[in-house]
Design a protein with these regions (language model features):
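Sec/Tat signal peptide C-region and signal peptidase I cleavage site
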Residues: 21-27
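Asparagine-centered strand-capping/turn motif at beta-strand->loop junctions
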Residues: 80-87
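Short, hydrophobic/aromatic beta-strand segments
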Residues: 87-94, 105-107, 149-151
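Short, solvent-exposed loop/turn segments enriched in Ser/Thr/Gly
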Residues: 70-77, 135
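Terminal connector regions
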Residues: 30-34, 40-41, 128-180
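Intrinsically disordered, low-complexity Pro/Gly/Ser/Thr-rich segments with frequent PxxP/GP/PP motifs
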Residues: 98-136
């Protein structure tokens, strides 16, 4: 705690410096995925992508509590795991939608390919409440042949008062084309 006039001055100065030098949390962009997870990526296969699918992943960036009188905001980390030991997984779309079903953000400008057993993530900070209480992701994927189904999950972290919460939402397949 800061006591006295001098203590308040130093406390205020420290908080101002902290505000200047600590980066603001922002939602991750498509370029951020490619740069942050460069070691998880490989070149897009030249063969025909004969197997494809899509996952729907609920993502609770906000949750109503106390009969709707209180709202708890959560950070969301979407993790997309290539569960194949042998084939790359091509991600064609990672889209974030709000409660009304309107697309908030598309995280890929172009398809990317994950190495076998690799993972990429998308982070939505607690301060980004554009998704609301019914936010969700849709992840479109493809592969050159039979492949282990990707594992797609969202981890929500947040708190309200002295309580802290963490929970996971698993993606559900909503589309499959080709033999898998």
């Amino acid at each position: 705690m800061c006591h006295g006039l001098i203590g308040r001055f130093f406390c205020t100065a420290f908080l101002c410096l902290l505000a200047i030098y600590v980066p603001v949390a922002r939602a991750q962009t498509g370029a951020g995925i490619e740069q942050t997870f460069a070691n998880s990526l490989t070149t897009i296969p030249t063969e025909n992508l004969s197997v494809s699918g899509a996952f729907y992943v609920p993502a609770y960036s906000s949750v109503s509590m106390s009969q709707g009188k209180t709202r708890a905001d959560f950070s969301v980390t979407l993790s997309i795991h290539n569960a194949s030991e042998t084939r790359p997984l091509v991600l064609k779309r990672i889209a974030y939608f709000d409660t009304a079903g309107k697309m908030v953000e598309n995280y890929l400008k172009a398809p990317i390919a994950l190495k076998p057993f690799s993972t990429v993530e998308v982070f939505v900070p607690t301060t980004d409440v554009r998704g609301g209480t019914g936010a969700n992701f849709v992840v479109d994927w493809a592969a050159t042949g039979e492949i282990a189904e990707p594992v797609v999950e969202a981890l929500m972290l947040g708190g309200l008062g002295s309580g802290h919460y963490a929970f996971i939402s698993q993606g559900r397949p909503i589309k499959a084309v080709g033999k898998n």
